[in-house]
Amino acid sequence: MTNNSGSKAELVVGGKYKLVRKIGSGSFGDVYLGITTTNGEDVAVKLESQKVKHPQLLYESKLYTILQGGVGIPHMHWYGQEKDNNVLVMDLLGPSLEDLFNFCSRRFTMKTVLMLADQMISRIEYVHTKNFLHRDIKPDNFLMGTGRHCNKLFLIDFGLAKKYRDNRTRQHIPYREDKHLIGTVRYASINAHLGIEQSRRDDMESLGYVFMYFNRTSLPWQGLRAMTKKQKYEKISEKKMSTPVEVLCKGFPAEFAMYLNYCRGLRFEEVPDYMYLRQLFRILFRTLNHQYDYTFDWTMLKQKAAQQAASSSGQGQQAQTQTGKQTEKNKNNVKDN
């Protein structure tokens, strides 16, 4: 196996987590596949140079500590320093929803969108009950689990999360304006564009844009061109504000427009009615006569690919028997995410 992870491969962190290869990277640094030397368990290892201007891994590790035990929150194995790096060792998860969207040719059925929506709302609700906002809701930050957790959705990347109320007094942070936009501009709420301090309503509105991204395959404010990043953000903001919810959701069940209108109508400190939002989509799911069987679009594709691989493998064996020659076959055209 070729190794593209440079000098970090074979490094052991936390006394028992051996780095195998690089599997991703972000603004903070790199993510490696690691193996636990004591039991052979695979883990994900995030490395951040201690020289970075704005370190965020320590903060993120504190967030994971607070959130531990929640459904769909990855387990944190270890945090510490190793060879000039801050290191966070987590459960190894499966592909992100962005990966799976691409795998499914950027088309999700309504059944898949609704099954995902149910879990996504619950993940954000849990983070909010722990007094934090996520502030970077996007398909890349929702990952499916692996093995027996392959149908469970996990929420990751709490580097931009912010405490919105005090644990003891339950005092909410004050309303402010002139704030810089935090998060991913494509899914940012209108109030975030306007420079208003984010609160629970903004996470929920961002989620509504993710739903419509999956439904439509793209959002009307994608692909806008501008000379500078600032001008691009302004164009996106203008397009988002000038696109009525009914236009954004045209051609899709009314529940999606109801969801977005509800979120946009929330007051700064107001608690979203998470159960009402889940029920919107659960009732729609039943109305459309879907079965909640965790058969997602990618489940079907992978099953089909596995069947094709098995059948081509069988044909290969037949050909080998007939000709006495080994026939090299492509066993599977799907990456095991």
UniProtKB/Swiss-Prot annotation:
Pfam families: Pkinase. Its main location: cytoplasm. Residues 17-285 form the Protein kinase domain. SMART domains: S_TKc (SM00220). It is found in: Cytoplasm. The keyword Kinase applies. ATP binds at residues 23-31, 46. GO terms for biological process: negative regulation of canonical Wnt signaling pathway; signal transduction; Wnt signaling pathway. PROSITE patterns: PROTEIN_KINASE_ATP (PS00107), PROTEIN_KINASE_DOM (PS50011), PROTEIN_KINASE_ST (PS00108). The keyword Magnesium does not apply. It is an enzyme of class 2 (transferase). Residues 309-325 have a biased composition (Low complexity). GO terms for molecular function: ATP binding; protein serine kinase activity; protein serine/threonine kinase activity. One of its GO terms (cellular component) is nucleus. Belongs to the protein kinase superfamily. CK1 Ser/Thr protein kinase family. Casein kinase I subfamily. Interacts with FAM83A, FAM83B, FAM83C, FAM83D, FAM83E, FAM83F, FAM83G and FAM83H (via DUF1669). This is Casein kinase I isoform alpha-like. It comes from Homo sapiens.
